[in-house]
Amino acid sequence: MFKKADRKEARERRHLRVRKKVFGTPERPRLSVYRSEKNIYAQIIDDVNAVTLVAASSLDKAIEVKGSNKEAAKLVGELVAKRAIEKGINDVVFDRGGYVYHGRVEALASGAREAGLKF
């Protein structure tokens, strides 16, 4: 019971440490990742104006996943990259949200890179 709470708190501490260094500007916004048990969410954020420019998640109607969570994460990465490029955003700073760069987070990042986003 306590282990999950400790894991969540450790992730939040890591995220705060990373957020001190990772900052999104209007020229190069931040690609933020949030991972829940079932779904994965990605936002491209301009931290100067505190505005979400683009968002995508595995709950979007554009994503119909019949496979694994990693496949869904890759599709979310491709979708967020496609939406960002439509808005003229090509370069971003990747914010893994305190999660280990592995599994679903890595799949989302590789999907976004393959779709043309640079980070």
From Swiss-Prot:
Alphabetical list of SUPFAM superfamilies matching this protein: Translational machinery components (SSF53137)
Keywords from the UniProt entry: Ribonucleoprotein, Ribosomal protein, RNA-binding, rRNA-binding
GO molecular function, one term: structural constituent of ribosome
A GO CC term assigned to this protein in UniProt: cytosolic large ribosomal subunit
GO annotation, biological process: translation
Assembly information from the UniProt record: Part of the 50S ribosomal subunit; part of the 5S rRNA/L5/L18/L25 subcomplex. Contacts the 5S and 23S rRNAs.
Purpose of the protein: This is one of the proteins that bind and probably mediate the attachment of the 5S RNA into the large ribosomal subunit, where it forms part of the central protuberance.
Name this protein carries in UniProt: Large ribosomal subunit protein uL18
Organism ancestry: Bacteria, Bacillati, Bacillota, Clostridia, Eubacteriales
